[in-house]
Amino acid sequence: MHYHVTLHYVTIHHVTPHHATMYLLEHDAKELLAQHGISVPHGRLIGRNDTIDRHVLPPGPWMVKGQIAAGGRGKIGLVKKAESWQEISTQLQAMLGAAVGGGLVGAVRVEQQVKAAHEAYIGFLLDAASGGVRVILSDSGGMDVEQVPRDRIHSAVAAPEVRDLVECVRKLAVNLPGDISKAVVDAGEKLVPAFLELEAVLVEINPLFVLESGGWIAGDAKVITDDNALPRQRALESLVKTRVADYADVARKHEHGFDYVEVDPAGEIGLLTTGAGLSMMLIDELRAAGLKPFNFLDIRTGGLRGETKRLTQVLQWIGAGKKVKVLLVNIFAGITDLGEFSRLLVTALETAHVRMPVVARLVGTNLSAAREVLAPAGIPLHTDLDAALDAVRKHLGKGDE
């Protein structure tokens, strides 16, 4: 699940959930930013099991917005206008529980429509290469921001300090029309401290509604934070604890101590892997080969400590995947003893009652011992990834493709 917006020569790579990040739902992003002085439309969150009371809604007309952790919702039917309570009800029925982009819409935000004179764009993105923050402004925002001409996008990198970032916004905003420039600068002065205080990876307002009065309102808000900062971010920590269904991946990581993300509920290949970078590369390899991975996992073999609990838990999660047909184990071990790992794996497979075929690709220390353990369990061991993928294809009935 990669999220990115390409603004011609400026590309914002919205970090994937398994990059130790927490992608907030729009409603939560707006509620959090409102606490930092950001103007947002009045709205309410409605869940699948909520009793809907029209009297708690703000005055209409409204926007009905399905809540998923992804951009481009307007293009997939998750952002609709409503002029009446009946239209709201119809949209809620259509959106709640809908399967979209590998997940389900668990909640909908109903908020006031905003009558804007103009739609602009402002974003702040952590720039790992420079150690700074990239500031991006445009006088043209909205659903088709990717199509904005190059000369209307203004970007620069500044140090992660309030004064430096605000100054960067002011300098870039000189390139915008006067009324839009003033609104963008004002919004930037409030967004900068919010970005830093939240320890965010990305804060993006698109569109930033510029009003006839010269004021502004955040039409949509995208916030991605570093989930390693949760112990310092009480509001975010509370979200994870009280809304586990909405932030299941982050909740799992902080409860169990490793990264596990279901990337595609329709995925056919369960992955037992270690190393975040290698695991992401494997997912890319599978997709490029036309195969469908079910999950991302960085099991962190060093944390097993001779116990099967972590492996068993992961295998149970993978086994719950309705479409999963084969398990691919891909471990590149430096310090980890592959013989010991294989013994733990075989025990965990038995404990978790895994009945699907298992293909193992192992590289590293004590490989011969691993082979001796896996062979009696009927698990073929490969050291070459292509050979392992060929075995996976055969189990999926795709051996001749």
What are these regions (language model features)?
Residues T21-I205, F209-V326, V363-E401:
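ATP-dependent carboxylate/acyl-activation modules
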